[in-house]
Regions:
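Extracytoplasmic cell-surface/polysaccharide-interacting catalytic and binding patches
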Residues: 1-75, 79-200, 213-227
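Conserved metal-phosphate-binding beta-hairpin within the catalytic cores
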Residues: 206
Length: 227
């Protein structure tokens, strides 16, 4: 359980809606492409309505202030998808260490579990502790050029190491690191300008209305639970 999971949830009933098609998406969707159990392609690109409204403003502002577009990497995840991706990440980490294990024995390797949980929320079916993406309030975003091509940010989305920390390059003074840090700063500044909160371990992960957002903004409760 994360520290922000202590925040109570009072879901305000905001609807889960499709993200407008004029925003840029990563295609093909990375998890759907891996076989994650989405109901169908229409259920992939969705968020809570207020989150979508804020995201549109972010994209418009970003375009007006820079040469970049916002590129949406991932959005709402049904719990089944969160479970699929969490298990996959755990088993891949086991393979790297030449450990042959079934997911049912996950607690036998607490160090691997701890590493995975730093980047992937546990797929809890307890409504008090929903994974951020399963609330419809969290999304993963990158910068792209005007043609939708990914801009280098210093690590890949979902890369499970220290380079994914939002501030990893802040004190590294080579030319590439300075560029990557400035791009991460730009993304964070614009997302937070429109009310989003950034995940402490992931430069790409932002949310509005979930428990992480409530914790970072010192709110009494979260606005969104599992949906």
């Amino acid at each position: 359980m994360k520290i922000w999971n202590k925040i109570p949830i009072k879901d305000n009933g905001d609807k889960l809606i499709a993200i407008p098609s004029y925003l840029k998406f990563l295609d093909p969707h990375p998890y759907f492409h891996l076989g994650a159990p989405y109901k169908d392609k229409t259920s992939i690109w969705k968020l809570r309505e207020e989150v979508v409204n804020r995201l549109v403003k972010v994209n418009d502002y970003l375009i007006s202030k820079s040469s970049f577009n916002l590129l949406i990497y991932d959005s709402w995840r049904p719990l089944e998808v969160q479970e699929f991706m969490f298990k996959r990440a755990f088993l891949l980490e086991c393979e790297k260490s030449d450990i042959d294990i079934s997911f049912e024995n996950i607690k036998s390797y607490p160090s691997i579990l701890k590493k995975v949980e730093k980047f992937w929320a546990y797929p809890s079916y307890d409504t008090r502790f929903p994974p951020p993406h399963s609330t419809g309030g969290a999304l993963d975003v990158c910068l792209s050029d005007k043609d939708g091509n990914l801009i280098e940010m210093g690590s890949m989305v979902d890369q499970m190491d220290e380079t994914s920390n939002p501030y990893f390059y802040a004190n590294i003074k080579n030319e590439e690191a300075i560029i990557w840090n400035s791009r991460r700063n730009l993304l964070r500044e614009i997302m937070t300008k429109f009310g989003f909160a950034q995940h402490p371990n992931e430069w790409w992960h932002f949310s509005y209305g979930d428990q992480l957002w409530a914790w970072k903004n010192k709110k009494a409760n979260a606005l969104y639970g599992k949906i």
